[in-house]
Amino acid sequence: AASDVYKRQVLQFITHFTDSYSYYDSACMALEGGCRWIQLRMKDAPVSEVEQEALRLQHLCRDYGATFIIDDHVELVKKIHADGVHLGKKDMPVAEARKMLGKDFIIGGTANTFEDVKMHYEAGADYIGCGPFRFTTTKKNLSPILGLEGYRSIVSQMKEAGIHLPIVAIGGITFEDIPSIMATGVTGIALSGTILRADNPIEETRRIINIEKINNK
């Protein structure tokens, strides 16, 4: 099922609206470049607009056999049967979302500390979006920056606690950062700006997926 595809993905692409690209364009390019895990993130947009965009993107992701999740909008995820939801620190708690959605939907939670990870794990999250790695322009109100040391520390505390969850690094990550971030033990990376700022976002997505394939051999 498309909803399981994300478990084998190193790259999660987060849609972003820029001067050059719409949310839909940005998702098209990431999918064309080989990404199979897309998150629609439209902070502060009216729900009706998010729904319109989500239906188009969901259709697109299904064509590519990609996992499609939506940031924050739990009710919408349930209504249109998206694959899952990503919940930020100020969004609905993971446990509450799990009650609403049941076990068949993916729920990801944002974490900045091991305590956050533990809380999400106990609440039934399927993966963790962990960051920020460094300062990022696509997000307002950032938590303290983790850097490589922060990831190493969280990954080792997870091992000690016997917590096995995919952990996706996020926040201002560039192409050059990827090998050293993956070496900390995280399972993936989430990108937005890095891909969209490239001269050719499709090629950039391919390049990112390829460095990962090389590193995993």
Give the residues covered by each predicted segment.
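Conserved, mostly hydrophobic/aromatic
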Residues: 38, 77, 120, 128, ...
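Alpha-helix-loop-beta-strand connector modules within alpha/beta enzyme cores
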Residues: 51-69, 89, 97-112, 144-168, ...
